[in-house]
Amino acid sequence: MASTTTCTRFTDEYQLFEELGKGAFSVVRRCMKIPTGQEYAAKIINTKKLSARDHQKLEREARICRLLKHPNIVRLHDSISEEGFHYLVFDLVTGGELFEDIVAREYYSEADASHCIQQILESVNHCHLNGIVHRDLKPENLLLASKSKGAAVKLADFGLAIEVQGDQQAWFGFAGTPGYLSPEVLRKDPYGKPVDMWACGVILYILLVGYPPFWDEDQHRLYQQIKAGAYDFPSPEWDTVTPEAKDLINKMLTINPAKRITASEALKHPWICQRSTVASMMHRQETVDCLKKFNARRKLKGAILTTMLATRNFSAAKSLLKKPDGVKESTESSNTTIEDEDVKARKQEIIKVTEQLIEAINNGDFEAYTKICDPGLTAFEPEALGNLVEGMDFHRFYFENALSKSNKPIHTIILNPHVHLVGDDAACIAYIRLTQYMDGSGMPKTMQSEETRVWHRRDGKWQNVHFHRSGSPTVPIKPSCIPNGKENFSGSTSLWQNI
């Protein structure tokens, strides 16, 4: 077999510098392209820790970012795979977050808010024209190109972005950030490009008064507010906002996505395209003061999550931040991205690996079996007479003395599989295992057992760490008409079902 040459293009062409940010499986560092001296931001993903699903998402993000070339979008310049790592080389944006810049300004008006949202709408319109839905528009993803006055707003982080055909509406999964989720996503209805416009409405509302339109300590009540479109323009802060600004917000925060304003339509709205004559130029000190508090809350939430990640308690952090609808939770986590889009696919992944394990058993392939099982596999099974079995030796006996010596065809069906996902790297599956085979006289036989298996993902691979099987223990003495290891007197579990 020919050897594969390992790519070292990133290592050869780029020099890495300080860390700019960190995620669960990635780190962002400043880098320089050695031949040109040009500086960039490198997102470095540890691919050894990624599941097949994560690899697909990485490929999707790179594909989308390569497609989008716009002054108001952080541009991807290079995408390089090396041994164990993938490098995404982006624009180096040095201006920080838009919302942090606003509170540092001496003067901030409605006209400034109009200019900000115009740039955001330009980026969203470019995405939509190219069949891309961002799905996670929020202040954290709105950056400034530099610290210079009048620097361009740049839309960042396309990790949740999806590709759509035209005005396609479909269920792409529950994804986004709680305070910015649209009613159709919360209703679990088909959705598409309009979800980004709803988020733009939330952002514009905050830009004008410094606090969000939807807010509640209880996440269930927050979601009820959003689904009902229950927001208003309270006095006195909204009294000084022009009717045209409120009109644009109303058009963006329209519950029915079919009637919601599009990005291209919003760019033609008088408050945007006739800013100099329509938008107020009055300084909004109250907005700046409220926005400072809003930013402080966001930073506190981010610091809490970072601490959880640093203490390697990421699963616990995600379980806290990803409560299901109806669970009481402070919206202090409302700037944290949620993604449940691939729950169905992840459950199918568990069913598939369970089927692979059973196939290894049926084939008497102990080598394949050990690759799928944790070396410290624990099990409760009838043959152990109520004792907890640990390790592979107990199972090795059946492979060496029955399974590998059997040449009879075996067919196994998994019935009614129920998968429980426990965080990102653990799952439990319960199912009925139906096994068909031919007995010594050539007659078809079927046996049934009820099984539960616990799976844990390590380095991107699922391993069975525990299982529990029902049934009666195999009787060691068998009638002569039945081949060794195939069935006991009562027709209960055969040796190939002991593992």
Curated annotation (Swiss-Prot):
One of its GO terms (molecular function) is calmodulin binding. The modification Phosphoserine is found at residues 315, 319, 330, 333, 404, 490, 494. It catalyses: L-seryl-[protein] + ATP = O-phospho-L-seryl-[protein] + ADP + H(+); L-threonyl-[protein] + ATP = O-phospho-L-threonyl-[protein] + ADP + H(+). The keyword Phosphoprotein applies. It holds the Pfam family CaMKII_AD. Its EC number is 2.7.11.17. Residues 291-301 are annotated as: Calmodulin-binding. ATP binds at residues 20-28, 43. It is found in: Cell membrane, Sarcolemma; Sarcoplasmic reticulum membrane. It comes from the Eukaryota. GO terms for cellular component: cytoplasm; neuron projection; postsynaptic density; sarcolemma; sarcoplasmic reticulum membrane. Its main location: membrane. The modification Phosphothreonine is found at residues 287, 306-307, 331, 336-337. The modification N-acetylalanine is found at residue 2. InterPro entries: Ca/CaM-dep_prot_kinase-assoc (IPR013543), Kinase-like_dom_sf (IPR011009), NTF2-like_dom_sf (IPR032710), Prot_kinase_dom (IPR000719), Protein_kinase_ATP_BS (IPR017441), Ser/Thr_kinase_AS (IPR008271). Autophosphorylation of Thr-287 following activation by Ca(2+)/calmodulin. Phosphorylation of Thr-287 locks the kinase into an activated state. Activated by Ca(2+)/calmodulin. Binding of calmodulin results in conformational change that relieves intrasteric autoinhibition and allows autophosphorylation of Thr-287 which turns the kinase in a constitutively active form and confers to the kinase a Ca(2+)-independent activity. The CAMK2 protein kinases contain a unique C-terminal subunit association domain responsible for oligomerization. Belongs to the protein kinase superfamily. CAMK Ser/Thr protein kinase family. CaMK subfamily. CAMK2 is composed of 4 different chains: alpha (CAMK2A), beta (CAMK2B), gamma (CAMK2G), and delta (CAMK2D). The different isoforms assemble into homo- or heteromultimeric holoenzymes composed of 12 subunits with two hexameric rings stacked one on top of the other. Interacts with RRAD CACNB2. PANTHER family: SERINE/THREONINE-PROTEIN KINASE. This is Calcium/calmodulin-dependent protein kinase type II subunit delta. It comes from Sus scrofa. The gene is CAMK2D.
